[in-house]
Amino acid sequence: MLGESREEAERIVRAAREEAERIVRAAREEAERIESSSLAALSQASRNVLLSFQDSVTRSLRAIISMETAQAYDAGVLRELIPRVVSAWVQAEGDKLELILSPADLRTLEGVFCAALQEQLSAGVELRSDDCLTAGFRIVPAEGGSYYDFSAAAVAQLFSSYVSARVAEVLSLLRRSCDVFLLLPYNAATISSMRRGASFALSGFFGLCATFLGSAGCCGAWKYLVVSRAGA
């Protein structure tokens, strides 16, 4: 009787231990699943935010480039530049061409160009305006079919393409340097909660992002923080 009671007690203890181990194992597996799922979601969110940030930076830079390029094509620059360009063109390609300016620039500078390009104008160079042009100029060869675009919009697009590629390259390098990249609202609670959870380290890119976003007016009064998982 005593032996049976001891065996029953051992069986109960063994069953309880196995059940406890099963519960612990299941809890560990569930925790790992949740962690893996959370990291995957965070990584996807970080990629989405990074792409959004890249678009925002690119749009801001394009706006700046367009504004600065248009301002650079002032009357003084055109007064000096266009006679040189037209003279060089005539020597290399012939004197049958159209010089197209914005209506405002043509009104302002027509007298200047008529004096500076008198010989070329008498030989076949024509001046005209195009309402679609806001700054800069275009040269249209006599045979037509194509034109050489030195308008502010075309030059700005050229610079913007280069800048867009450089922004993408820089952010791509940054993204590859850490497995989690995220712009977060910056406050004490955010920092505290991150330090209590998975180990995070502040990125040195924070200053650049916060400064640029603030100056570009993309986030108003918010400050943003770039974080990467520690050891990444």
Curated annotation (Swiss-Prot):
<comment type="similarity">
    <text>Belongs to the V-ATPase E subunit family.</text>
</comment>
<comment type="function">
    <text>Produces ATP from ADP in the presence of a proton gradient across the membrane.</text>
</comment>
<dbReference type="GO" id="GO:1902600">
    <property type="term" value="P:proton transmembrane transport"/>
</dbReference>
<dbReference type="GO" id="GO:0006754">
    <property type="term" value="P:ATP biosynthetic process"/>
</dbReference>
<keyword id="KW-0066">ATP synthesis</keyword>
<keyword id="KW-0813">Transport</keyword>
<protein>
    <recommendedName>
        <fullName>V-type ATP synthase subunit E</fullName>
    </recommendedName>
</protein>
<keyword id="KW-0406">Ion transport</keyword>
<keyword id="KW-0375">Hydrogen ion transport</keyword>
